[in-house]
Design a protein with these regions (language model features):
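Conserved alpha/beta cores of soluble small-molecule-handling proteins
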Residues: 1-94
Length: 94
């Protein structure tokens, strides 16, 4: 499953990922994002990226929906599923 997405609690093919028209990010553009690079299957500076994501979300009064530890685990699971040792992980919270 090379190109994958994690949407609403599930991993699946990127081509099948959809966002509800009722999503606030879709309707009003509210959202934050982070891009995390991986090297040899390891996310680079993951704690710093997740801390910045959390700060950015708090500034917009958005919940990131998971703890940093949970996001770290999800990111590592996504890497395992994708089978890409070198990747860019794009996290978008709306």
């Amino acid at each position: 499953m090379p190109d994958i997405a994690y949407v609403n609690g599930r991993f699946g093919p990127l081509a099948d990922a959809v966002v509800s028209i009722e999503d606030r990010g879709f309707q009003f553009g509210d959202g934050v994002y982070e891009v995390i690079r991986t090297y040899r299957g390891q996310p680079f500076a993951i704690e710093e990226h997740l801390a910045r994501l959390e700060r950015s979300a708090q500034a917009l009064q958005l919940s990131i929906g998971q703890t940093r530890a949970q996001w770290s685990s999800l990111i590592r699971e996504g890497l395992r599923l994708s089978q890409f040792p070198e990747a860019k992980i794009y996290l978008q919270i709306t």
